[in-house]
Amino acid sequence: IEENDRRFRVKKKINDFINSSLKEQKGYARTKAIILTHLGNGDHITCNGLVRYYSTKYDSVTVFCKKQNLHNLEEFYEDDKSISFHCVESDFIYRPREVEKYAKNNNYNNVIVSGHIKDNTYDDLPFCFYQFLDLPHNVFWNYFHVPTLPKSQELYNSIKNYDYIFVHNQCSRGEMFKVEEIFKQINENTLVINPCKNFYSKNHTFYSIAQTLCNESIASYKLIMENARINVVCDSSFFCFMINLELKYDDNFLYKVSNGNWDYTKIFEKYSFDNTKINRKKFKLFENKI
């Protein structure tokens, strides 16, 4: 029965997405769950697969998120009407009783919490969030999806005829490496796209186009990253996004902090995936040289 219900939910998602007039009706009691993971943008992208997985087990799921991240999340799940959000303040602290009370008062059937248990260890990021819930690692790969937004297509169309690279060097800990080091290694006719900052002077040929590509939502850069000749990123939300994208080229680099205890470049060796549907790429370590 449970698998039949899941198949129905998946068919409903497809029908909703294509706006089909053929709507199958089911007579079972509707269920809903609330999901709480870590609340950074990168954490939400990491947990995209588990959220979409649980959205096939329940008729609707609600994801805890900070107010400042709501817009990004709405875009991550724009294609699925069964996924909604409960906003909390930036200083939110997980208190089990409060979450359980909220769930009970709002008639949720289940509370799904990952990453808020005191004894949790995070050596196996990002897969530990799935292990905490006893989910197989392939849920991370196979259920991940962020739709291609019109804005993503618009931004990519504006630079698709340029020779360009994508660089993101900032995370919650600040600036991780100097973009100027990359400028020294590339042809002057190569456009450097950074989502947070325009590195060109106002009289430079690339200033205007680089300016139009700054400060957009994370999902808006999907096609730009997928088609970049070179990607160079630090351990940030953009890296969390990029490892599950269909990158066109092989030169994709990750800057690893010196005290990091988890080598993300070996993810694909330890946690294999089926690459027949999405051509994911391995990452190389960036050591100020591309």
What are the residue ranges of the model-derived segments?
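Catalytic machinery of carbohydrate-active enzymes
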Residues: 31-290
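Anionic, Ser/Thr-rich low-complexity intrinsically disordered regions
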Residues: 1-30
